[in-house]
């Protein structure tokens, strides 16, 4: 539900600026690829069975967005909007999971450090 809200806010604020929306989505998908490449969420070099994220499909989405950003008039032939939305949601989910884990590790570290002072 929260991911849908983020997506709706982005769409609403960027509706008239498709170029900016493309750039934001490209960067988010690149972040997802970087996270997958780091091995934190991927079992292998291409797919992560736990999340169903296929890196090759993400690269195709990035290429699609670059064509859209460049003003390709015949974008309907690619048929990627649903795939793109799915990967965008996956990207946000992975980023939020990483943020929660980082926050939890930081809090545990703070608790450990504060107990050293007591």
UniProtKB/Swiss-Prot annotation:
Name this protein carries in UniProt: Bovine agnoprotein
Organism: Bovine polyomavirus
Lineage summary: Viruses, Monodnaviria, Shotokuvirae, Cossaviricota, Papovaviricetes
